[in-house]
Amino acid sequence: MALVTLGINHRTAPVEIRERVAFTPERMAEAFSELRAASGASEAAILSTCNRTELYLAGDDDCAPSVLRWLAGFHELDVADLENVLYVHRDSDAVRHMMRVAAGLDSMVLGEPQILGQLKDAYALAREHSATGSFLSRLFEQTFSVAKRVRTQTAIGENPVSVAYASVSMAHHIFADMSRNKALLIGAGKTIELVARHLAEAGVRSFLVANRTLEKAQALAEAHGGKGILLSEIPDHLSDVDIVISSTASPLPILGKGAVERALKKRKHRPYFMVDIAVPRDIEPEVASLADVYLYTVDDLRQVIEENIRSREGAAREAENLISSGVQDFLDQLRALDAVSTLKVFRQRAELLRDVETEKALRALRNGTDPETALRSLARGLTNKLLHQPSVQVRKAMAEGRTEVTECLRELYQLDALEADEPTTTEKL
């Protein structure tokens, strides 16, 4: 079974490409069905976040070109648009890549924990669509185990830094005393939950949470003494807030330039701080052209995030060692499973030959053959049958100069020990 990973991330592709390659929840069922058909893979999983889209495939090692064409077609892109930003990992490199992603070593924010939850969600979604089998299931479980060891045995998770944390950190550049500011959070997912927590820790006391589902908005808002509203109510409240941070799975922008312009007039040009964490973007890019609006995307957060990376570099080196060990453990598991499978087939073949020769001997006995003659014929026939195919392959290997085959045979049957123990002609006499 070959493992192939294809993807783009914040290092290889700008947000303009990433948002077009992101998978929306509404199209996941369609994506799984088409992906497996296009790739010929027996197992598949899809990870789609604001910073990366990755496809994990178990099956044909040559599926990368067909998957690239499918990915471009599914998102209505030219293949050329993706070729220069797409990376491909195979087999052990793909295993290492997944483990590094899960541990946060490949994230924009080194060591950030959210990606592990997102990877678990991707695995659950693949299982929900019956897209995984024993191979990917074993890989995901091993990956989660390694990520847990990285989290508990290194300092990679200390000094919390994330896209959510970086967003709040940047707000301090605009507002020195954030206790005077009111925040509007658009969305109610895990990232927005983190944003709300960091804003509260930074001193923000007034919250609005807007979401497509009012109940979710209210639940998150009430946890921080705020108010939940529907997305359609945002224009009514926009002029009252100073900070807008958005992270939804909407395929279309939620906040447009016109709505912000009208709110600015009511605010008498008091500044807005906005961060659009979503991919595809929730806030129209044209909003950035407005005076008194400071709009940032996930790519703009890179500088803030890089300042925090240095504190985690030592822990990252320790994490890499744990991951190397995890990769080796997984490969050892696969080899052990392959050995079990091979031995099972080997035994089945031997038992089949035994049954054939036993039936011959029984027929001979029923026909009146002397029992000793029948037994000797059974032993001779079974020996010949068991040794015929290995003998043919050994002769072929020797003719081709592949001496390692005979070395393997000598090791399997301990022939050197047998030769050493065999008595000489004189001893036999």
From Swiss-Prot:
Keywords: NADP, Oxidoreductase, Porphyrin biosynthesis. Pathway: Porphyrin-containing compound metabolism; protoporphyrin-IX biosynthesis; 5-aminolevulinate from L-glutamyl-tRNA(Glu): step 1/2. It is an enzyme of class 1 (oxidoreductase). Substrate binds at T49, C50, N51, R52, S107, E112, P113, Q114, Q118. The record marks H97 as: Important for activity. The active site is at C50. InterPro entries: 4pyrrol_synth_GluRdtase (IPR000343), 4pyrrol_synth_GluRdtase_dimer (IPR015896), 4pyrrol_synth_GluRdtase_N (IPR015895), GluRdtase_CS (IPR018214), GluRdtase_dimer_dom_sf (IPR036453), GluRdtase_N_sf (IPR036343), NAD(P)-bd_dom_sf (IPR036291), Shikm_DH/Glu-tRNA_Rdtase (IPR006151). Signal peptide: none annotated. Transmembrane segments: none annotated. The keyword Cytoplasm does not apply. Its EC number is 1.2.1.70. CDD domains: NAD_bind_Glutamyl_tRNA_reduct (cd05213). It catalyses: (S)-4-amino-5-oxopentanoate + tRNA(Glu) + NADP(+) = L-glutamyl-tRNA(Glu) + NADPH + H(+). NADP(+) binds at G187, A188, G189, K190, T191, I192. Possesses an unusual extended V-shaped dimeric structure with each monomer consisting of three distinct domains arranged along a curved 'spinal' alpha-helix. The N-terminal catalytic domain specifically recognizes the glutamate moiety of the substrate. The second domain is the NADPH-binding domain, and the third C-terminal domain is responsible for dimerization. PANTHER family: GLUTAMYL-TRNA REDUCTASE (PTHR43013:SF1). Homodimer. Belongs to the glutamyl-tRNA reductase family. This is Glutamyl-tRNA reductase. It comes from Marinobacter nauticus (strain ATCC 700491 / DSM 11845 / VT8) (Marinobacter aquaeolei).
